[in-house]
Amino acid sequence: MINISINKPIQPLLIGKVGKSYGILGWINIFSFTEEQEKIFNYLPWFFFKEKNWTRIQIKNWKKYKNNFIVHIKDISDRSVVSQFTNADIIISKHTLPALKKNDYYWNDIINYKVFNIDQHYLGTVINLIRTRNNDILIVKNKLKIHQKNILIPFIDNKIIKNVNTDKKFILVQWD
């Protein structure tokens, strides 16, 4: 049997960021971008991506620390070695995420969806989503000639977000 090692994720998906090293024994701070922060540890293996370089890592141990986590990487027990990963992106292969039910979606799936208001006016294309304390925000690249800035639309289901059509890749919003 041949052992094949994947050195780069298939369908890369950003799920977190590496912070600075912690202590002298090779621990490092981790910032999770997952909806439930602790679920970042359900999606393995991780790949660190920094300065166009991929590094597949294995987690030896992790702990909750303040509002984030600290991680000990297998085979690294030196602060100077682990510090090379500071500010790296934490990437997984998209296929490691759980399968979704019909009409469910992950945030990254709706990037590039077209956005229309309920009057069928085309507003633009989704370029990002951000989490805020009160509600998530849909960032739309504005296609209206009047304003050139991005449109920020609160992601409030049924009130503002009327429909997310995953088959036709568009979002219908209550927005002027």
From Swiss-Prot:
KW Membrane (keyword) present: no
Give the record's GO CC terms. cytoplasm; ribosome
Does the keyword Cytoplasm feature in the UniProt annotation? yes
Main subcellular location: cytoplasm
Look up the record and give one Gene Ontology term from the biological process aspect: ribosomal small subunit biogenesis
UniProt-recorded Gene Ontology molecular function terms:
ribosome binding
Q: Which UniProt keywords apply?
A: Chaperone, Cytoplasm, Ribosome biogenesis, rRNA processing
Enumerate the InterPro entries for this protein. PRC-brl_dom (IPR027275), PRC_barrel-like_sf (IPR011033), RimM (IPR011961), RimM_N (IPR002676), RimM_N_sf (IPR036976), Transl_B-barrel_sf (IPR009000)
PRC barrel domain: residues covered: 102-175
The subcellular location is: Cytoplasm
Q: Quote the entry's note on domains.
A: The PRC barrel domain binds ribosomal protein uS19.
Record's subunit section: Binds ribosomal protein uS19.
* Family named by the database record: Belongs to the RimM family.
Q: What does this protein do?
A: An accessory protein needed during the final step in the assembly of 30S ribosomal subunit, possibly for assembly of the head region. Essential for efficient processing of 16S rRNA. May be needed both before and after RbfA during the maturation of 16S rRNA. It has affinity for free ribosomal 30S subunits but not for 70S ribosomes.
Q: What is this protein's record name?
A: Ribosome maturation factor RimM
Highest lineage ranks of the organism?
Bacteria, Pseudomonadati, Pseudomonadota, Gammaproteobacteria, Enterobacterales
Q: What gene name does this entry carry?
A: rimM
